[in-house]
A protein has these predicted regions:
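N-terminal [4Fe-4S]-dependent radical SAM core
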Residues: 2-72, 81, 85-93, 108-116
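Conserved Radical SAM active-site core
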Residues: 12, 36, 51, 67, ...
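Glycine-centered loop/turn positions within well-structured domains
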Residues: 78
Length: 170
């Protein structure tokens, strides 16, 4: 009986890890930039070539209509008492993700989004702490015909121009 429990527990751990890596998002499927020193990372962040991402998920919950890819960005200047995602507050807790990799991920799911009336949602943390990255992904998503949604406190609204806001559906 002990051997059965041990084998079952091992299989359960393996299946949970498989689900986490392939179905649940996390950061699977993204190649993290390596070899960038601090100065180069800051420049890439400022230009939007990379973004610091806490995690991502495909879901049908409260992050907008239809089936959505919700990207949880790292970093937030606020410390709201009832924050849903306090684990996203620190920018350094996120992983750098290349812009091209994020756009490829959106492209991979665009047919699903169109079939379900879904799209991509940026949440956080505070997405507007990384306006160049989010804006460039939204622009690419809109060019693909993918619905876009920004979940923000609005605290950093000055970081977005009217032109950038035009790429946001909700």
């Amino acid at each position: 009986m002990a051997a059965f429990r041990s084998t079952t527990a091992h299989m359960l751990r393996e299946s949970k890890e498989y689900a986490r890596q392939t179905l649940m998002g996390g950061l699977s499927g993204f190649e993290s930039p390596v070899g960038l020193d601090r100065r180069d990372r800051l420049q890439a962040l400022k230009s939007g070539d990379i973004g610091f991402v806490h995690s991502w998920d495909i879901n049908t919950s409260v992050d907008g209509p239809g089936t959505r890819m919700t990207v949880f960005m790292s970093g937030c200047p606020l410390r709201c008492q009832y924050c849903q995602n306090p684990d996203t507050w620190k920018m350094r807790d996120g992983q750098p993700v290349y812009l091209d990799d994020m756009i490829k991920k959106v492209d991979r799911y665009k047919d699903l989004f169109k079939a379900t009336g879904g799209g991509i949602t940026f949440s956080g943390g505070e997405s507007m702490m990384q306006p160049a990255f989010v804006s460039r992904v939204f622009r690419a998503a809109r060019e693909m015909g993918v619905h876009t949604c920004l979940d923000t406190s609005g605290f950093l609204g000055r970081n977005y121009s009217d032109e950038q806001i035009d790429d946001i559906d909700l």
